[in-house]
């Protein structure tokens, strides 16, 4: 009996933390090897490892500029969950997460870097407690929980309250996924997961959530650093955050929003953050986290 056969016979709860290849082939979980290699070469040639963490995140974010926007890049199977990266197409979540994963990866000096090295970093930040056991609910699906979980494990500092005055979110639910399960590939295939997902959502709603109103962001931009993770808080019902990207201070002195843009259909460095927020009525404000 080989190791893969043995692992397949174990209950999910008995599985240790494994690389993505143990759940799905890297032919499915790692797309764009040539671009990965090119970005890593650029980072090594520029000695990006010597930069502070936030600056490294910003550099990798800029290296991903122009990558086309592709929605649902996290939904790669009907039933099996596995850490994944797609350098040929990014959505807002996978953009910031890939830049962060690359920045974390090169912090450890190695002669070379492989897809497995990045996938391990993705697993560490994408999944609750840093562990994927092959189940859909191992993954963190709401950005507010991503901030809480990763801050608790020392991957980021949640600094919204230090950046500017905050307002507490009230009168809102955080249940978008359980209300609309048919738009999620895994939930369509496994509707039995919905009650457990709803329990997670109910738990998240009990966690106090504070944000900076968009009208106050312009006065706060000087305290935001390049590479900070910017969660966009929405006025929409049933979810707190609807978008995410990275801050980037550019040569003109502006604090700009770098993100995978559905409108532009690619990764871009957008307007100054406060202008970007003002231009979209549904945006209510921001939350901020700093990679460490």
Range-by-range predicted roles:
Residues 70-202, 259:
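Acidic/His-rich structured neighborhood in mature extracellular/periplasmic domains
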Residues 230-288:
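C-terminal soluble interaction/assembly domains
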Residues 5-22:
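N-terminal export signals
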Residues 33, 50, 54, 58, ...:
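Solvent-exposed, acidic/flexible segments
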Residues 42-50, 79-89, 234:
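Second-shell loop/turn segments in exported
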């Amino acid at each position: 009996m080989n190791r893969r056969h043995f692992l397949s016979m174990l209950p999910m709860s008995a599985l240790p933390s494994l690389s993505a290849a143990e759940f799905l082939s890297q032919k499915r979980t790692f797309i764009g090897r040539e671009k990965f290699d090119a970005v890593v070469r650029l980072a090594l040639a520029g000695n990006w490892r010597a930069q502070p963490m936030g600056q490294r995140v910003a550099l990798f974010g800029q290296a991903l500029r122009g990558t086309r926007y592709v929605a649902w890049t996290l939904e790669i199977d009907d039933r099996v969950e596995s850490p994944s990266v797609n350098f040929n197409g990014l959505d807002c979540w996978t953009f910031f997460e890939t830049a962060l994963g690359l920045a974390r990866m090169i912090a450890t000096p190695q002669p070379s870097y492989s897809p497995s090295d990045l996938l391990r970093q993705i697993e560490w930040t994408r999944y609750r407690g840093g562990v994927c056991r092959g189940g859909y609910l191992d993954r963190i699906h709401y950005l507010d929980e991503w901030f809480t979980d990763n801050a608790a494990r020392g991957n980021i500092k949640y600094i919204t309250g230090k950046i500017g005055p905050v307002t507490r979110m009230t009168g809102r639910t955080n249940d978008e996924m359980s209300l609309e399960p048919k738009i999620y590939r895994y939930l369509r295939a496994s509707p039995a997961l919905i009650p457990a997902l709803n329990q997670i959502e109910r738990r998240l709603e009990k966690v106090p959530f504070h944000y900076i109103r968009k009208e106050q962001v312009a006065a706060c931009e000087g305290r935001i650093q390049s590479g900070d993770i910017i969660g966009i808080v929405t006025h929409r019902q049933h979810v707190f955050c609807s978008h995410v990207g990275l801050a980037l201070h550019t040569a003109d002195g502006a604090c700009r929003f770098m993100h995978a843009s559905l409108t532009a259909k690619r990764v871009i460095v957008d307007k100054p953050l406060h202008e970007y927020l003002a231009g979209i009525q549904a945006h209510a404000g921001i939350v901020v986290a700093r990679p460490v």
